[in-house]
A protein has these predicted regions:
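N-terminal module-boundary/linker segments of secreted carbohydrate-active enzymes
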Residues: 1-65
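Catalytic cores and adjacent binding grooves of peptidoglycan-active enzymes
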Residues: 124-131, 136-206
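A generic structural signal for short, non-catalytic loop/turn and secondary-structure boundary residues
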Residues: 47-52, 113-115, 133-135, 194
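Active-site-adjacent loop/helix surface patches within enzyme catalytic domains
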Residues: 94-136, 147-149
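Generic structural hydrophobic/aromatic packing signal, biased to beta-strands
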Residues: 54-57, 84, 88, 120, ...
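Active-site acidic/histidine clusters and adjacent loop/turn architecture
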Residues: 47-111
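N-terminal post-signal-peptidase region of extra-cytosolic proteins
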Residues: 36-43, 68-74, 124-126
Length: 206
């Protein structure tokens, strides 16, 4: 078991003590093998795979309770992503779930359909042969049903997703999460011209 590939959350950063931890709802507690290796799509280079780590994160979910989840990212952006989640927690930004996409058979549609937040997924950009930033663990999608992708052709992904700024769990320009990502030079799909992908943050290079 690659326990060194699982980065535990700093409880002090989340202002959590043993009393609060006892009441936390665990959404994901996967091993590295389960989260990263199980069913991994063919063709993922070792150069990419070797850099993936599991971050343990805490978040306020829509039941009003604290949950613990996991997200797989490139180790070189791990501190930045962990800071995003601590900021989300501090500002009481609600997140539905944070579970590695392997739980959904590496199927992005299935993960988005239940509004799951995820990162690493060795796949191409939809309708292209180009590898997504998710393939390197350099992209994060947050609450995809609440922050859907409005494509140029008018398609909304995931189907049924509705973007309503001001509602809980919805990302908007200037909020703490967007600011934190931008502080570390991540791009946000909410700033794209011609189409919007409000769920999506990506890093060009690390």
């Amino acid at each position: 078991m690659n326990t060194n590939k699982i980065l535990q959350a700093d409880l002090e950063a989340y202002s959590l003590d043993e009393t609060k931890i006892a009441d936390v709802i665990v959404d994901s507690d996967m091993s590295y093998e389960e989260a990263v290796l199980n069913g991994l799509p063919k063709g993922c280079p070792e150069e990419i795979l070797s850099k993936q780590v599991i971050l343990e994160v805490y978040y306020l979910s829509f039941d009003g309770k604290i949950h613990k989840g996991q997200i797989v990212v490139d180790e070189r952006v791990a501190k930045e992503v962990q800071e995003v989640f601590t900021v989300a927690f501090e500002t009481k930004f609600q997140i539905t779930s944070v579970i590695p996409i392997s739980k959904f058979g590496w199927d992005d549609d299935k993960s988005m359909d239940v509004d799951n937040t995820s990162a690493f997924n060795y796949r191409t950009i939809a309708n292209t042969d180009i590898l997504s930033r998710h393939s390197r663990g350099w992209a994060v999608d947050i609450n995809p049903r609440l922050n859907p992708h409005y494509r140029k052709d008018g398609e909304i992904v995931p189907p049924g997703g509705i973007y309503e700024a001001g509602k809980p769990g919805v990302l908007v320009e200037g909020d703490a999460i967007v600011k934190t990502f931008k502080k570390y030079c991540w791009g946000w799909g909410g700033n794209w011209i011609g189409e919007k992908d409000w769920q999506h943050f990506e890093k060009e290079e690390v």
